[in-house]
Amino acid sequence: MYLNGKSLYESHLLERVLNPQPFPDSRDRGASTYTWFCESDDKNTYLYANFHSQNPNEHLVEINVRDSCFYPDQPGRDYITVCGFRMCHAATQWAAPTAEQIGLIGTHWSKGWIIEHNEISDSKCSGITLGKDHATGHNVWTTDRGKDGATHYNEVVERALKAGWSRAKIGSHIVRNNTIFNCEQTGICGSLGAVFSQITSNHIHNIWTKRQYGGAEIAGIKLHAAIDVLIQHNRIHTAGRGMWMDWMAQGARITGNLCYDNTTEDIFLEVDHGPYLVDNNLFLSSLSVSDMSQGGAFAHNLLAGKIVSRLETGRFTPYHPAHSTAVAGLTNISGGDDRFYNNLFVGPSESSSNAPDWDGKTQRATGFGLWVYDTRKFPLQTGGNIYYNGARSYTNEANALVMSDLDPKPTIVEEGDSVYLHLTLGPGLQKATTTFVTTELLGKARIPNLAYENPDGSPLEIDADYFGKKRNAAKPAAGPFENPAAGELKLKVW
């Protein structure tokens, strides 16, 4: 239900409409007291709503029961372009990775769509879905609770492969230049169906702001099997979790994204084996990276928040031949085998908040800098990293540049439709022992034994910065910006 275009909060009890109380976790607690309730008998459906002092007869009140706004009736509707629409108000269902994922707009297990220059908002769950179909399994855990979620999903992957899940039939979508907001599960999600796609230049915000429910599928962008997917130059904020690459993010490149004001973290990498590349990003929330994977490469990022390093020995997840959906094997996450080159790590404003945070039971380490990887089974490759304001380096890191007495104070300021980053990196930036990042430097991810390369198999190099400015191959600047000034900076980042 909507009042003047703004969705009300659904309640499961009439009492909470008659006597509403603010939802404690909502990011707009005042709005959370505008509530509605529905009940039915054999003949009628009754709707109750609390509009406070506003007379609904004098305002626009809308009721919506549609499961989507634009969604094909069957899989395989390929090569459709959706451009220039304003789409809003859909009663979408929860889009689990083992289910058919129906969004406000969705591709329904197809190939080659272009979704661009649209404004998409107010989905009960997901905005855009690039997900799988019904036939490969639909909420399979509800019919067999004797198996754990990883087993169910591995079986879904096997069924999808038998049904033709491949570059030839699925994925290769382009999602660009859209504005997506007011969705309570994801801005963009896709289980298996987003392979080989490009998600670029989207503004995704106000995701999971009501917080009436939670779950393991909530983010600005949430993908399972981001195989050879490019996620570039997106602005993701006020989204709970910014990006979530869950299972099989092999060959993915996550580059040049702006993330801030995300209360969970900016990016979560879950049970991926590599190779994948995370470069030139601005991770400015209080928790920058949650890493429950291995085999990743992180280069030229600005990480202003904490890092979490976790193992996952209980789940066995797929890895693949290069640039393929075929499964080469299954294994768990022992941790490490990551590469960190030319990054900027910013510590806390108070030294006490960088005290070691170690949970022996879950093998989880949390803190500012790469020390959280010190105990991991597989070593890191490192070089050219700078540690500010108490952020701590990896124990075995050679030539780390530590500037504990300098706080860059990265601050985001929104001015109309533009976003500016204020920070001070100091004159010591040029002292970092940096290296030009290439396929040769990064080597091969241990588990799949594959190189970090472009989706077409050609060697890659990080030859441009966040703004597209050419990098100095002889001595690139650490961080996302090539040759920034030493004084206080004001950079237009969106």
Please tell me what each predicted stretch does:
Residues 1-109, 121, 129, 136-165, ...:
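Extracellular polysaccharide-degrading/modifying enzymes targeting complex plant/algal/animal polysaccharides
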Residues 188, 197-207, 353-381, 476-493:
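C-terminal/domain-terminus segments
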Residues 42, 65, 98-100, 168, ...:
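Short, solvent-exposed coil/turn segments
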Residues 248-249, 256-258, 262, 268-425, ...:
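Extracellular beta-rich repeat passengers
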Residues 14-29, 53-67, 100-108, 113-114, ...:
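Short, charged, low-hydrophobicity "junction" segments
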Residues 78-91, 111-125, 137-160, 167-186, ...:
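Right-handed parallel beta-helix
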